[in-house]
């Protein structure tokens, strides 16, 4: 949560330049890896094209990790079934809304309901992955161990 709030506290120009640098690294890495031999103008063009997408993927990734870090402990402490996505989703989406509200006080930034929706995609995927892998672990690891202990 601290990391997300720290990114949100950055002024718009700082945040934009950081994500632009990441976009530039991606384009230059692709240029080198695939030996495309793009000119500097082409690198700038492709960097501009993916910049918005990189920003939105960063949103999804941040909230994906938040959802995992919230829903996994809830699962371990017995919150399962429909209650896990409801509780973890409420906490994470609520935090996303507060984060967008927080951005309204930062220079060059503003709140966006659309960003909360994009954040919710990462939240949804993170919660589903926790449910899937924890259920899989219970079926494949812990259930056979429980049967083994009963025989002893």
Task: Describe the residue ranges of each PLM region.
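"…centered on the first transmembrane helix and the immediately adjacent amphipathic helix/loop
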Residues: 1-61
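Small-polar-interrupted transmembrane alpha-helices in polytopic inner-membrane proteins
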Residues: 1-2, 84-103
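Alpha-helical membrane-protein architecture signal
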Residues: 46, 50, 87-90, 114-117
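Membrane-interface loop-to-helix entry segments
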Residues: 52-66, 113-121
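Membrane-interfacial alpha-helical segments at the cytosolic side of multi-pass membrane proteins
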Residues: 62-76, 121-137
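Membrane-helix interface segments
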Residues: 77-87, 109-113
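Interfacial helix-loop-helix junctions of multi-pass membrane proteins
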Residues: 96-120
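Membrane-interfacial, low-structure loops and terminal tails that flank and connect transmembrane helices
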Residues: 140-152
């Amino acid at each position: 949560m601290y990391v997300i709030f720290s990114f949100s506290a950055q002024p718009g120009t700082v945040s934009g330049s950081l994500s632009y640098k990441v976009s530039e690294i991606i384009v230059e890495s692709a240029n080198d890896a695939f030996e495309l031999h793009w000119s500097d103008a082409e690198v700038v063009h492709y960097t501009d094209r993916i910049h918005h997408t990189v920003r939105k993927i960063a949103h999804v990734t941040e909230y994906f990790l938040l959802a995992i870090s919230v829903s996994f402990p809830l699962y371990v402490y017995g919150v399962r079934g429909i209650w896990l996505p409801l509780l973890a989703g409420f906490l994470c989406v609520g935090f996303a809304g507060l984060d967008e509200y927080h951005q309204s006080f930062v220079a060059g930034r503003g709140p966006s309901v659309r960003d909360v929706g994009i954040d919710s995609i990462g939240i949804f995927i993170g919660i589903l992955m926790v449910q899937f892998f924890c259920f899989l672990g219970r079926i494949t690891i812990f259930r056979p161990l429980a049967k083994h202990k009963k025989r002893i």
